[in-house]
Amino acid sequence: MSSIRKKDVERFILSDDYKPMVLKELYKKFRAKTREQRKKVREVVKKLEKEGRIFRDSRGRYRKLGEDLKVGTIEFTRSGYVAFVITDDFEEIAVPVEDTKYAMHKDRVVVEITGTWRGLPRGRVVRVLERGLKRVVGVFDHKGTFGFVVPDDPKIAYDFYVAPENIDGAKPNQKVIAEILKYPSPGKNPEAKVVKVLGDLDDPSIDLPSVIVKHDLPEPGEFPEEVIREANAIPARVRKKDLVGRKDLRDKVIVTIDGEDAKDFDDAISVEKLPNGNYLLGVHIADVSHYVKEGSALDQEAFKRGTSVYLIDTVIPMLPFRLSNGICSLVEGKDRLTMSVEMEIDRDGRVVRYDVYPSVIKSKKRMIYERVNEFLEDPSSMKEYEPFKDLIYNAVELAEILREARRKRGAILDIESDEVKVILDENGQVVDIVPRKRGIAEKLIEEFMIRANETVAEIFDHAGLPFMYRVHEEPDPETIFQLKNYLEAMGIRAKFSHKIHPGMLQKLLEKVKDHPLRSSVERLLVRSMKRAMYSAVNIGHFGLASYAYTHFTSPIRRYPDLVVHRLLKLYLEQNGYFTPEQIEKFSKVLPKIAKHCSRRERVADEAEWDLVAMKKVEYIARHIGEVFNVVVTNITKFGLFVEIPEKSISGLVHISTLDDYYYYDETRNMLIGKRKGKVFRLGDVLKAKVVRADKIRGEIDFVLVEEDEE
């Protein structure tokens, strides 16, 4: 009996000679008669199907993907008219809802390209490969003896039928978690069973678990047993043998500067002024790779998570707290293992010399952003920082030099964040929402981390070795043309050349620095940008105007940084050389890691945004009927999106509530009244009354009011 080799089966299926076959035909082809032989064939088929290289058609045949067939994750929209399939290469394919073939939000699907739609490829779903959702969170609705779960996520187009035996004591209008039993099919709703009743809709404590289930995140602080076992086996202190091959920096003045609530300290800095007038900047990053070994249970779980998720006052860490808040965290007064990037920087912001090496440090002070800013305002107010004044003043000087150097090369610097801090009480209820301010301390740490990330990326770019880059594509020319039209409609003239460069956009920001519409221009600019992501191919970072960039500085909370540390260590150990086998290995695995981590980052961002949006609705619900000054942030054919600037709370003024029949001028992004000729533009400051706040949908409605209506 001849043995069957999996690689032969895979080679045949992927060959040009292969014609679509059912499983029985593959068994026959390879003379697979025993259970073990057939199992090998099935395993290859399942592997290729999971990788999206083949799929099973309606006749049960396994087909290869041709030019007209793509595999990706389907994402529905709130409107429900169209969905988008995001391929593994981040290509977007528009799929009209009637062509989604019972696929649900987040399913992995095969889509056939059928044409174009608004500049994107248009397609239809031909098969669901893998269901993306296993659980759903929503509101329970009782219908006689049975019930339905109405999902919180408007992107899920179905309500889930719940049989009487699966209600589990849920009452109408309670938030529940339900396990999906059956997925949609012709003429039938999907089915689910209630597995947990979270509570009543007005209970603020249900928001966090709702977001966790909606985005399929792990429970805070929970890890698989094997991961916990590995973490517990790691020593809680640095040992003598850990210091071999490391530069001892424990006597140097090295400090951390972070937010008041931070517990996982990834990065520390040292700054000295040299006799020649240059600066010596040290960026010292937690050596997580010393403890988290490639292929270990800790590593596999960190890869799966991809990133830590910060949900207001709760963190879902990438690594167990024993590491993230313990031995890896650069806490004051404790020996800690680090990877150091030491850079001599001249008065023009150029790195004239650098060194990268494994090290051991002992942080001399755990500084806090707000207190450093207070010290810079009034040194006498912060006596505890007095011994570190030289470091602080040198850091401020150097950060300004680096920032000016980035400005000169065209980096986009002047976009003010509209991030807010949500303050909760012990019950999870919103007390207040305040702008998250960024002072000098926050900006100087940002400058130092950017420079360290660039230095590490440049090493690998020059060496031509496989690497994990952080890339940011330039905007599409059509988007910039549209931006120009919008700006002109706001009365702001902008000169854009055919060759798009970040310096053009930075000049625009400088031009509107003191303009009343500055924040509106910044929003438009952000909207016109593409999303930064991870890639094994270096295409540069548009926003930073960096020709090579990476993420090296946060390995406690980002998996790509951990990968970069491993690559950097190997580079140093092997004197800037990778073996052919290593090059082959990294060339295969790095693109997969980059795609996965880009997806996980997106999930984390959406979860963080969702919870903040819920809390904004909860906050504004206490102000129904009140009038606020608002700014128009977006205009659509169905109304105006407006924002309360000091709270970053947005909502809709529906076109049906306006005082005239308005038509939408898409080119200039305006609503124009037909009878009165009144025009609404981006950046308009108006008065609006809050009339509705729907926490489940995350929606807020306003109506405009005249001065005399207040």
Swiss-Prot record:
Its EC number is 3.1.13.1. Residues 246-573 form the RNB domain. GO terms for cellular component: cytosol. Keywords: Cytoplasm, Exonuclease, Hydrolase, Nuclease, RNA-binding. It catalyses: Exonucleolytic cleavage in the 3'- to 5'-direction to yield nucleoside 5'-phosphates. One of its GO terms (biological process) is mRNA catabolic process. The keyword RNA-binding applies. Residues 625-705 form the S1 motif domain. Belongs to the RNR ribonuclease family. RNase R subfamily. This is Ribonuclease R. The gene is rnr.
